[in-house]
């Protein structure tokens, strides 16, 4: 079992680039930078794409340029074109239920109210069985404040924790493709940025 497509969820445009909701895209941006494979806009995939070699595997990167709640359009377009199955897709997204500094891998499950995940599940034929990288951003403590929170920028101290977790997740993704998901998961799930 391998990963052929890594997706970083985001809202498009400079005004959203530094917001918590774009944490998934920060991870894909980091992978692209590390592998000197700049993301380029490809309209047929409704996003920015690139290709990298990860532990000997050919992996495509995607950051949709649709708004978050239409992310599935981009993911389905690329998965269909390259004949990539849902269980060969890793979707990185911001996670309210994890604190900043923590990231976790997960296979399948619901969307937990995340509109990007909701649309991807729908556009993959109601198939939730893709991998996720949950990037912790914390929770504002009141569900009525969630929208403003995810569309806000984290303070510098939280940003550093999120960046450190994203950095560790990128390392663990390479471990996954080289040594298997169990080893990668054990390492990532033991990590907490200080």
From Swiss-Prot:
Name the major location: cytoplasm
The record ties this protein, via InterPro entries, to:
Pept_tRNA_hydro (IPR001328), Pept_tRNA_hydro_CS (IPR018171), Pept_tRNA_hydro_sf (IPR036416)
Q: Which residues form the signal peptide?
A: none
List the residues marked with site Stabilizes the basic form of H active site to accept a proton.
Answer: 94
Q: Where is the active site?
A: 21 (proton acceptor)
Which residues make up the annotated site Discriminates between blocked and unblocked aminoacyl-tRNA?
11
Q: Name one GO cellular component term.
A: cytoplasm
What is the E.C. number? Answer: 3.1.1.29
Q: Name one GO molecular function term.
A: peptidyl-tRNA hydrolase activity
Q: Where does tRNA bind?
A: 16, 67, 69, 115
Cell compartments where the protein resides: Cytoplasm
Reaction(s) the record says it catalyses: an N-acyl-L-alpha-aminoacyl-tRNA + H2O = an N-acyl-L-amino acid + a tRNA + H(+)
Kindly list the biological process annotations in GO that this record carries: protein quality control for misfolded or incompletely synthesized proteins; rescue of stalled ribosome
Q: What class of enzyme is it?
A: hydrolase
Record's keyword terms, sorted:
Cytoplasm, Hydrolase, RNA-binding, tRNA-binding
Q: Fetch the PANTHER family from UniProt.
A: PEPTIDYL-TRNA HYDROLASE
Biological role stated in the UniProt entry: Hydrolyzes ribosome-free peptidyl-tRNAs (with 1 or more amino acids incorporated), which drop off the ribosome during protein synthesis, or as a result of ribosome stalling. Catalyzes the release of premature peptidyl moieties from peptidyl-tRNA molecules trapped in stalled 50S ribosomal subunits, and thus maintains levels of free tRNAs and 50S ribosomes.
Record note on quaternary structure = Monomer.
What is the name of the protein in this document? Peptidyl-tRNA hydrolase
Q: Which gene encodes it?
A: pth
